[in-house]
A protein has these predicted regions:
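Walker A (P-loop) phosphate-binding loop of ABC-type ATPase nucleotide-binding domains
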Residues: 2-7
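Helix-to-loop junction immediately C-terminal to a conserved catalytic motif
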Residues: 16
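Q-loop/switch helix immediately C-terminal to the Walker
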Residues: 50, 54, 60-75, 87
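ABC ATPase C-loop
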Residues: 123-124
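Walker B catalytic motif
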Residues: 132-136, 143
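Helical segment within the ABC ATPase nucleotide-binding domain
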Residues: 145-158
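Conserved beta-strand-loop-alpha-helix hinge in the C-terminal portion
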Residues: 174, 179, 183, 187-209
Length: 214
């Protein structure tokens, strides 16, 4: 969490290797492997996933074809149609997503909530080691937020990690975070649990700045 301009989205971009961001110092390690020099696609194959704030629309490409192609690209393994289709339907039902969405063109005509649910479906299919959700709750009403983040909670396991970037405390109604980090001026200034979120909701980020002399 952090105020506008704190560097939250920049952190996400650095982790996935977005070309508009440059890492000037330090190391990025994934399972003890330094990945500083890896390109975006190479990091994706290593297991890093980024959910976009504003997912792209691609006419002519169905959700199912997109996901099957992405799975093949990430794993390097052929995904046979019927087996993949059956697995996809099972995942969609688990996430309370209408299986008919699989035949729709990617994000075309989707509501904001449907686009975000589709991002979570991508997570379920690709099974990343590190999933970064950059303000996935942005623009969602409470009902859509509930559906999306209950889906996120279902995908959390002991074998993966999730970095959830948000401005708002409402997502924590549906998630149980291991840690809450506060980012200000490009660095983590405070770490704790849900009590930090409650303090921010009550007093704002100014209280943290004051307490830490920032």
């Amino acid at each position: 969490m952090g105020p506008n301009g704190a560097g939250k989205s920049t952190l996400a971009g650095i982790l996935v290797g977005h070309p508009k961001h440059e890492l000037t110092s330090g190391e990025i390690r994934l399972e003890d492997e330094v990945i500083n020099d890896l390109a975006v696609d190479e990091r994706a194959k290593k297991g890093i996933f980024l959910s976009f704030q504003y997912p792209e629309e691609i006419a002519g490409l169905t959700v199912e074809d997109f996901l099957r192609t992405a799975k093949e690209a990430i794993t390097g393994e052929k995904q046979y149609f019927m087996q993949f289709h059956n697995d996809l339907v099972e995942k969609m039902e688990k996430l309370h997503i209408n299986p008919e969405y699989a035949d729709r063109h990617l994000n075309v005509g989707f509501s904001g909530g449907e686009k975000k649910k589709n991002e979570i479906l991508q997570m379920a299919v690709l099974e990343p080691k590190l999933a970064i959700l950059d303000e996935t709750d942005s623009g969602l009403d409470r009902d859509a937020t509930k559906v999306v983040f209950e889906g996120v909670q279902k995908l959390k396991t002991k074998d993966n990690a999730m970095l959830i970037i948000t401005h708002y405390d409402k997502v924590l109604d549906y998630l149980e975070p291991d840690f809450v980090h506060v980012l200000m001026d490009g660095r983590i200034v405070k770490t704790g649990g849900k009590e930090i979120v409650e303090m921010i909701e009550k007093f704002g980020y100014g209280k943290i700045r004051q307490d830490l002399g920032l």
